[in-house]
Amino acid sequence: MSLATAQAMGQDDDNFYKDKTITLTVGITPGGGYDQYGRLLARHLFRHIVGAPTIIVRNLPGAGSLTSVLTLAKIAPTDGTQIGTFNAGLLNDSMTEGDQTRVKFSQFSWIGSMTRDLRVCVASKASSIKTWDDLASGKDAVFGAAGANSNSANGIATLRNLFNLDHLKIITGYPGITETNLAVERNEVDGTCASWIAIPDGWVRDNKVNVLVRLSPNTLLEIPSSARYIGDIADTPAKKDIVDALISSSELARPFIVSDKVPPSRVAMLRKAFTETMADAEFLADAAKSRLLIDPVDGGAAQKIVEKLYAMPPETAEKVRAILKN
């Protein structure tokens, strides 16, 4: 490529987003953590993109976010005017199930992740499950989740299958965490597993739930110390290896991607804008006001994490596949 051609392409990119609209699709129903993060990004990202395009948010739920991801891969414009965020649980499914998920996330261009995840499993005070030991000892429980390949379903399946808790049943099919939480409040299910940010403020404060387990090694002061980390419960090296593999995708807890057909120079523009937004004072103040944790992974680093996930040894992938079967 000649210098003149490269300069011309750069000028085209500089002008591309002027008077354009970017659609940010959220593969989850309104109200949950993915939706909150998507709307937060949409409120601030435009200021860091040359041309200051309008950014609109469109919720496109279905099949645990798979519908929105397939739309991005097969139908969405490939010029950089559509960005997608999705239930990160699809990452684990796609790296273990291969063609069955119909999507491979290493074949998308990653813009970044707004935070690393901190996930917990909780049980309603109305249930018989007060602690992890109650669950581990054989007390019956029914936990609710979104799609069968969602992070919530994967978290519950991990507890059940890694620790042989056959008495723990999973009900999937709730449109999103908002509806799952409502099912817990109505005592339709005993509990759920979810991102900490998606757990309603009043649940712990008002003593409505017991926090049983952390699915992430990190924690916060407001999470009860009685909530045990799953990696500490795993009592064999083989189980600990599986836990390590399962939590690796939690590095990309709030992911944002575009089609791999978007021109590389435009991907670079979006990555740069994303990184700048994550350090923007106005953005950070908005995040703090909304109680949204910001612990970003930039686009290049996210791309490498995904490539590493798909390079998982076949024997480990087989074990993870068995654990996630729900």
Please provide the spans of the model-predicted regions.
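Boundary of Sec targeting at the N-terminus
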Residues: 9-11, 58
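Hinge/capping helix and adjacent helix->loop/strand transition within the periplasmic-binding protein
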Residues: 16, 22, 47-52, 71-82, ...
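Extracytoplasmic "Venus flytrap"
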Residues: 23-38, 62-64, 144-152
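Early extracytoplasmic/lumenal segment of secretory-pathway proteins
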Residues: 53-67
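An extracytoplasmic/periplasmic, membrane-proximal ligand-sensing/linker region
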Residues: 18-20, 205, 225, 261-326
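N-terminal signal peptide c-region/cleavage motif recognized by signal peptidases
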Residues: 5-6
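A ligand-binding cleft/hinge motif common to bilobed small-molecule-binding domains
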Residues: 88-100, 153, 157-163, 186, ...
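Short, hydrophobic alpha-helical packing/hinge segments within bilobed ligand-binding/sensory domains
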Residues: 66-69, 180-181, 200
